[in-house]
């Protein structure tokens, strides 16, 4: 009944991944991001992560697998997803939705920390404001974006961009794979 649809969806996902893999710059960016994160942890820093919708879930997934575990047991790493509902509702109500991440970065971000900002379009105003707040604090910035990078293009120390111009879910599928690879590489770097 839906076999053709299922095959088409899986083929499109595979094609998106294949296109991402064609650009060696993506591989190098992932490696540089993992080393940057591990170096921050080794120096006593932490990572703050943020995004909206599915990207928010990815930010939370990233943090929980750093503080908890990925594939094997190991010490937890300092990671916070900016996801506290009371913070988000307070700042959203009192200041505006565009400030929900930047206010948190202003409150807890420190020089030597890293911000991971996730936006499939690269145009999320609240993530862009978080990047600006991170810069003010002397933090490093890594972004996961899609399409042409949007307004976030060029704003990060390291941008990992999925150049897919279709639906956002294809970009998110690559983002979650990148997140898992980052964690795996961080674990290897931390074991050195």
Swiss-Prot record:
Compartment(s) of residence: Cytoplasm
Enzyme class: isomerase
GO BP terms in the entry: carbohydrate metabolic process; D-glycero-D-manno-heptose 7-phosphate biosynthetic process
Any matching Pfam family: SIS_2
Cofactor: how bound: Binds 1 zinc ion per subunit.
UniProt xrefs under Gene3D superfamilies: Glucose-6-phosphate isomerase like protein, domain 1 (3.40.50.10490)
A GO-annotated cellular component: cytoplasm
The SIS domain, residue ranges: 37-192
Keywords recorded for this protein, A-Z: Carbohydrate metabolism, Cytoplasm, Isomerase, Metal-binding, Zinc
InterPro entries: GmhA/DiaA, Phosphoheptose_Isoase, SIS_dom, SIS_dom_sf, SIS_GmhA/DiaA_subfam
Entry binding sites for Zn(2+): 61, 65, 172, 180
Substrates-to-products reaction catalysed: 2 D-sedoheptulose 7-phosphate = D-glycero-alpha-D-manno-heptose 7-phosphate + D-glycero-beta-D-manno-heptose 7-phosphate
Main location: cytoplasm
SUPFAM superfamilies xref list: SIS domain (SSF53697)
Disulfide-bonded cysteines: none
EC number(s) recorded for this UniProt protein: 5.3.1.28
Other observations noted: The reaction produces a racemic mixture of D-glycero-alpha-D-manno-heptose 7-phosphate and D-glycero-beta-D-manno-heptose 7-phosphate.
Function: Catalyzes the isomerization of sedoheptulose 7-phosphate in D-glycero-D-manno-heptose 7-phosphate.
Subunit structure: Homotetramer.
NCBIfam families given in the database record: gmhA (TIGR00441), PRK00414.1 (NF001628)
Protein name as catalogued: Phosphoheptose isomerase
Organism from which the protein derives: Escherichia fergusonii (strain ATCC 35469 / DSM 13698 / CCUG 18766 / IAM 14443 / JCM 21226 / LMG 7866 / NBRC 102419 / NCTC 12128 / CDC 0568-73)
